[in-house]
Amino acid sequence: MYSRSGIKSYRVSFDFYVSPAIKFLLIANFAVFIFEALLYRFSGPPAYGELLQWFGLVPARVILYLWQPFTYLFLHDLGSIWHILMNMFTLWMFGRELELVWGRNRFLRYYFMTGVGAGLVNVIVKMAPALFGQGIPRTAYIPTIGASGAIFGILVACAILFPGRRVYVFPLPVPLSMRTVVILMTVVTFLGTFGLGADNISHLCHLGGMLVGFVYLRRGSFLYSLRNSVSDWQYHRNQRRFKIYLGKHRKDPPSRPDNWVN
């Protein structure tokens, strides 16, 4: 990380420093991944499928398995090692700086809030047809796994806290601001959410994590603006009432007080 002409740039630091919360999450995720691999190897695909149905996020069953919006964050796809590697690398690269700014407890609260929130957004959207009497869609029985919802929430936090930070994005030869990177990712995720990306990636969870993180971090500004709007409305309302009162009593002679009250 360095400063040049007043612009902060961000380069991957290979000091391999791992903050406490990041260390906990890395160990937990890799431990669960190893357990998944061993279960698949020694018990076969049916047992692994049961694991995903129980602890992955299955929208049609989450009402009975209330732990799923939490546990799905620790499961990753065995079909590609890059799923967990990219998630954990991004967590380490960006999450440790957030933890240094926020502290361990606040960082963990934010991580799980965005991860669980992303899962709930996924559940609500996929179960929406059932609420309108159209039945439960087939996609509501497919388990969603991975920490990507929380990871995207972390990226949003970095874009809000460090908007001008310069990051290199492969394969682009020039660095982009953190805000620009997240905006581009939001556009891609939005298009993928509405079926414009033919893959098995849960773009909906990614978008949900970004949305929850943005709303949470911007809630102070929103509440401040809302409070000011209410105060302005009350002020103008009282001003109108005062003008009406003056209009009614303008011709009344002033009364002499018999005594003063302090």
What are these regions (language model features)?
Residues 169, 175-186, 195:
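Membrane-embedded catalytic cores of phosphoryl/pyrophosphoryl-handling enzymes
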Residues 140-163, 205:
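Membrane-interface micro-motifs in multi-pass membrane enzymes
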Residues 17-145, 191-218:
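N-terminal TM1-TM2 helical hairpin plus the immediately adjacent luminal interfacial "cap"
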Residues 115-119, 153, 157, 183:
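Small-residue faces within membrane-embedded alpha-helices
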Residues 57-63, 154-155, 183-187:
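Short, motif-level signal for alpha-helix interfacial/capping segments enriched in acidic residues
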Residues 1-21, 28-30, 189-262:
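C-terminal transmembrane module of polytopic alpha-helical membrane proteins
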Residues 100-101, 161-173, 221-227:
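Alpha-helical transmembrane bundle and helix-membrane interface signal
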Residues 106-113, 148, 172-180:
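Cytoplasmic-side transmembrane-helix entry/capping segments in multi-pass membrane proteins
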